[in-house]
Regions:
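Helix-loop-helix module between adjacent transmembrane segments
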Residues: 5-16, 20-30, 63-68, 102-106, ...
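Membrane-water interface regions at transmembrane-helix termini and the short interhelical loops
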Residues: 2-8, 32-47, 67-87, 135-142, ...
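Extracellular/periplasmic helix-exit of transmembrane alpha-helices
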Residues: 109-121, 272-295, 355, 359-387
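N-terminal alpha-helical transmembrane segments of multi-pass membrane transport
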Residues: 2-131
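Transmembrane alpha-helical segments of multi-pass small-molecule transport proteins
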Residues: 17-31, 56-63, 222-250, 267, ...
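Flexible loop linkers connecting adjacent transmembrane helices
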Residues: 2-6, 38-44, 71-90, 115-138, ...
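Helix-loop-helix connectors at the membrane interface of multi-pass transporters/channels
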Residues: 1-9, 168-186, 210-234, 265-268, ...
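Transmembrane-helix boundary/entry motifs in multi-pass membrane transporters
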Residues: 6-13, 48-52, 82-100, 136-145, ...
Length: 655
């Protein structure tokens, strides 16, 4: 099987239909861009008129749900087994969150959006101090907690079911509490196909718009002509860099690029802060944050029902639809890098840290731009923003003393954001089309990378980017229904998980007496200080634990239970007792490695020589952090019965 997976890990019912549907949609947008824009535009217009309330309510529910999960008893549950630890340090984690979630968007809209709201507010007169305050409130609202809540709820669903319940790390797993094993059938395939389409088309359209900003920056810096030909070359160059990043893997390629770009982003922001109206910007950040928090409930539910305007369809609904359509990609990427964190830690990190940085970025760039227009009278900046949002950032930076160097830094940042979006997008789509496999052949990632590049180039040549972007946002409506159902399923699963934890701690503490029986204290002491090798633990599992599991299984089968003893995984054994319609019981034992303390072994010895192993018990919810090495057969049977008794008590309470 291992050799087969080095050749291909694709899931045919998802891979092939996704490729065909992507080709069909791209051909429609390329061959008849005007017709495509009309069809998708009418769909979006219908949604704006008839379903705007649903979008607004759904995003509010997502935010409330993730906050509730963090502050409730569910917050202590880990995204993975109870013994798991985070795969990445906090800084690396934050850097990858930032790069995948908001990168190119911040560069594109950091100056443009606040200025556009300042000049043309949804209500009231533009170009005033009131309009300036309202512009920053709106910008904070669009880029703050709500956007990250959408990403967080998708990532929570995927990480919880994928890492804690060993389900595939794909969107189909979100429906497991609602439809059970049917996620592996046509319904699950359809969900994953939809996620592949949304991710490929979303990333491709973002790349198409992002390359326009790179072209604008190069035009300002080096007089590189602006045009489709140059942008196609830029896409090919960026995708070549993305290919190199993919070849080095998540732990090196994407992580290093993300950390580098976060440092560059902080540097650029600090330079603008220092060279701009520093005191005003610091005051504005504090006031903007206070105004945002004070108005968050009102803005969350504001549909301008008593002041009808087309503004909400072009801004708030556009953003909400885009965040939702973008969430399979970003949510899955966040889930991929968040294994081992508690729900409380996860929500705090995903909601507060990126949102806090984003709001600081918007203040430094947005308020600086508004200050230039409102106080310094630099009306040309407003005209440049209205003329071309891709050039807004560079028109803004050239007003500073080191404008050329700042613009050069900005171009590098946009390029790196471009690359991280492309390679993380290819990685996510590859996982979706491979049934959740985390380790897949390089050619599959390269295939999806080429598909996204070809899609972006084709749409760019045919002027079909806007049409497909509109289609992607319109597709968020049915996907929102799916997300609401999946969120309900997650809450249902968390309630059962928390109940099981409570029952386990309320029951009698686990007795170890079964394991020691009547053995002498000398033998027990020898077992405590023994530092077994892997081979010793494996032999113990094979000679003692496996027969104990088989004895329990045989007795339960006599009583009509469906029981399995799984010895297929190397060096481990697990006993599964089926409970149709209710959670199954799992008792497993496997070797777990530790490093011997320094007072026992020399630091100079080889790494392998310094390890010792324990025969640790694993239940459905993860490792239990106790060792049964050296126990007798009857002692192991007693431990199985103790754990099974607690499981049956949990099932009784949860009914």
């Amino acid at each position: 099987m291992a050799n087969e997976r080095t050749v291909s890990t694709i899931n045919p019912p998802v891979f092939y239909p996704s490729a065909v549907l992507i080709l069909a949609l791209v051909l429609f947008a390329v061959v008849t861009p005007d017709t495509a824009q009309q069809v998708f535009g009418q769909a979006q217009a219908w949604i704006t008129v008839n379903a705007s309330w649903f979008y607004i309510l759904a995003v509010a529910l997502f935010l409330l749900s993730v906050v509730f999960m963090a502050v409730s008893r569910y917050g202590d549950i880990k995204l993975g087994p109870d013994h798991s630890e985070p795969d990445f340090a906090n800084y690396s984690w934050f850097a990858m969150l930032f790069s995948a979630g908001m990168g190119i968007g911040l560069m594109f809209f950091g100056v443009a959006e606040p200025v556009m709201h300042y000049l043309s507010p949804p209500v009231g007169e533009g170009g005033t101090a009131v309009a300036a305050r309202e512009a920053m409130k709106i910008t904070f609202f669009h880029w703050g907690l709500h956007a990250w809540a959408v990403y967080a709820v998708v990532a929570l669903i995927l990480a919880y079911f994928g890492y804690r319940h060993d389900l595939p790390l794909t969107l189909r797993s979100a429906l497991y509490p609602l439809i059970g094993e049917r996620i592996y059938g046509p319904i699950g395939h359809a969900v994953d196909i939809f996620a592949v389409l949304g991710t490929v088309l979303g990333v491709a359209t973002s790349l198409g718009f992002g390359v326009a900003q790179i072209n604008s920056g190069l035009n300002y810096l080096f007089d590189v002509p602006q045009g489709v030909g140059v942008q196609v070359i830029l896409i090919l160059a960026a995708m070549s860099l993305a290919t190199l990043s993919l070849a080095t893997g998540l732990e090196r390629g994407i992580r290093i690029l993300s950390e580098t770009n976060l440092l560059l982003a902080v540097l650029l922001m600090l330079l603008v802060l220092i060279m701009g109206p520093t005191v005003f910007l610091l005051q504005a950040y504090v006031q903007n944050t206070g105004s945002y928090l004070a108005d968050i409930v009102d803005k969350t539910f504001n549909l301008y029902a008593y002041e009808p305007t087309d503004w909400i369809g072009g801004w708030t609904l556009f953003y909400w639809g885009w965040w939702i359509a973008w969430s399979p990609f970003v949510g899955m990427f966040i889930a991929r890098i968040s294994r081992g964190r508690t729900i409380r830690e996860f929500v705090s990190g995903v909601l507060l840290v990126p949102a806090g940085f984003t709001l600081m970025w918007m203040t430094v760039f947005g308020d600086s731009a508004i200050h230039m227009i409102h106080v310094q009278g630099l009306d040309s900046l407003g005209a440049a923003v209205n003329a071309d949002t891709a050039q807004a950032l560079f028109a803004f930076l050239q007003a500073f003393p080191l404008g050329y160097l700042l613009s050069l830094l900005a171009v590098v940042m946009v390029l790196v954001f471009f690359v991280t979006s492309a390679d993380s997008g290819a990685m996510v789509v590859d996982m979706l089309a491979s049934g959740g496999h985390g380790k897949t052949p390089l050619w599959q990632k390269l295939f999806w990378s080429l598909i996204m590049a070809a899609t972006a180039i084709a749409l760019l040549l045919a002027d079909g980017l806007t049409a497909l972007q509109t289609a992607t946002i319109a597709s968020a409506l049915p996907y929102t229904l799916f997300l609401l159902a999946a969120t309900w399923g997650l809450l249902k699963a968390l309630r059962l998980d928390a109940t099981k934890r409570r029952v386990r701690f309320q029951s009698l503490s686990l007795s170890r007496a079964h394991g020691h029986g009547s053995e002498s204290w000398q033998r027990r002491l020898r077992g405590m200080v023994m530092m077994p090798r892997r081979s010793h633990v494996v032999r113990f599992i094979q000679d003692t634990v496996t027969p104990a599991c088989e004895a329990v299984a045989e007795e339960l089968r006599k009583q009509g239970f469906e029981v399995e003893v799984d010895t297929e995984r190397p060096e481990s054994v697990s006993l599964v007792i089926r409970h149709p319609g209710e959670p199954d019981f799992l008792y497993g034992v496997r070797p777990r490695a530790y490093v011997q303390p320094s007072f026992i072994v020399s630091e100079e010895e080889e790494d392998e020589a310094r390890k010792y192993f324990r025969a640790e018990v694993f239940l459905r919810e993860g490792g239990q952090d106790y060792d049964i090495m050296g126990w007798g057969r009857d002692g192991v049977i007693g431990d199985i019965l103790d754990q099974y008794e607690r499981h049956r008590h949990f099932v009784h309470v949860a009914r």
